């Protein structure tokens, strides 16, 4: 007698998918939606993402590693040049490149620039994702999908898939995960169960502090903010049942006037940044946090190679 439905199990798949797109195209929000947890900071400020962060999606049949990259753009500073170089290096090492094109905006020169760059990477599978569909009408989404197909034809880019998705509402997020897994090579699990990111906790904490600092900032100031965690560890002498994580971090800006904006009247804004960041860090790490923040000036750090090295770029 044979067991019905007991045929060979599908092979396990694993691999890397990189989300690319112009600044503020929804890459980070989509990464968090697929992982199911906040592993990448988000903001409506362009060029929020400055590091390559890997978010890990665990499934019975696959492990999908999502590589969130800074937005590709025409750089105006040394920092911008280094971020672009970081993206291009990353794209050479992944299995699938997924280009994010917001459905609530027309395909523009920035999108064309990026897809042209992608066309130069010959052997990597390419997917187009129409992001932010919750902000567009059905007619607009249909028009956008046709524009994406046309852009592929014009640039010589062969799309393996074109997928409309809303990370905010969750619409088609699971479908996108299924499609991406299907494009991965067969392979073993690459990260332990339970790992949601490969970033060190110090980097995740610094990014959450920067996200809190960016809220409400205008003009060029968001680009001038950098955060470095100088010291982080469990406080000694605490009972095991009541741990406390001490984090000492510096928020860097480029000018004295910017320092005053970050601190705010009588330190009110800095306290607010600390309160919001502490809540996010505690939610991510599952440990009560004591957060000590200081604001320092690193003059013109975006253009200074020595300062960039000091700040981790």
UniProtKB/Swiss-Prot annotation:
Residues 21-28 are annotated as: G1. Keywords: Cell membrane, Cytoplasm, GTP-binding, Membrane, Nucleotide-binding, Ribosome biogenesis, RNA-binding, rRNA-binding. InterPro entries: G_ERA_dom, GTP-bd, GTPase_Era-like, KH_dom-like_a/b, KH_dom_type_2, KH_sf_prok-type, P-loop_NTPase, Small_GTP-bd. GTP binds at residues 21-28, 68-72, 131-134. It is a peripheral membrane protein. Residues 68-71 are annotated as: G3. It comes from the Bacteria. Residues 13-186 form the Era-type G domain. GO terms for biological process: ribosomal small subunit assembly. One of its GO terms (molecular function) is GTP binding. Signal peptide: none annotated. The keyword RNA-binding applies. Residues 47-51 are annotated as: G2. It is found in: Cytoplasm; Cell membrane. GO terms for cellular component: cytosol; plasma membrane. Residues 131-134 are annotated as: G4. Residues 217-299 form the KH type-2 domain. Residues 165-167 are annotated as: G5. Belongs to the TRAFAC class TrmE-Era-EngA-EngB-Septin-like GTPase superfamily. Era GTPase family. Monomer. An essential GTPase that binds both GDP and GTP, with rapid nucleotide exchange. Plays a role in 16S rRNA processing and 30S ribosomal subunit biogenesis and possibly also in cell cycle regulation and energy metabolism. This is GTPase Era. It comes from Nocardioides sp. (strain ATCC BAA-499 / JS614).
């Amino acid at each position: 007698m044979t067991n019905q439905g007991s045929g060979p199990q599908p092979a396990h798949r694993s691999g890397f998918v990189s989300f690319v797109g112009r600044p503020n195209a929804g890459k980070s929000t989509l990464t968090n939606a697929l992982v199911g947890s906040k592993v990448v900071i988000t903001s409506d400020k362009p060029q929020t993402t400055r590091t390559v962060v890997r978010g890990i999606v665990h499934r019975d049949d696959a492990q999908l590693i999502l590589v969130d990259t800074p937005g590709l753009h025409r750089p105006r500073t040394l920092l911008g040049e280094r971020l672009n170089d970081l993206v291009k290096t990353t794209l050479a090492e992944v299995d699938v490149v997924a280009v994010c094109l917001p459905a609530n905006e027309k395909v523009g020169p920035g999108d064309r620039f990026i897809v042209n760059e992608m066309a130069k990477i010959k052997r990597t599978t390419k997917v187009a994702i129409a992001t932010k569909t919750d902000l567009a009408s059905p007619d607009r989404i249909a028009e956008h999908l046709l524009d994406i197909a046309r852009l592929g034809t014009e640039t010589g880019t062969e799309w393996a898939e074109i997928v409309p998705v809303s990370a905010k509402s969750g619409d088609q997020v699971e479908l996108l995960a299924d499609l991406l897994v299907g494009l991965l090579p067969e392979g073993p699990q690459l990260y332990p169960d339970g790992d949601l990111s490969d970033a060190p906790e110090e980097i995740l904490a610094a990014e959450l502090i920067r996200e809190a600092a960016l809220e409400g900032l205008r003009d060029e100031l968001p680009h001038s903010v950098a955060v470095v965690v100088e010291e982080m560890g469990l406080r000694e002498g605490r009972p095991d049942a009541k741990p406390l994580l001490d984090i000492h971090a510096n928020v860097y800006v480029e000018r004295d006037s910017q320092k005053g904006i970050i601190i705010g009247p009588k330190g009110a804004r800095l306290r607010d940044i600390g309160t919001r960041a502490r809540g996010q860090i505690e939610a991510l790490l599952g440990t009560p946090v004591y957060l000590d923040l200081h604001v320092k000036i690193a003059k013109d750090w975006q253009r200074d190679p020595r300062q960039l090295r000091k700040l981790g770029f």
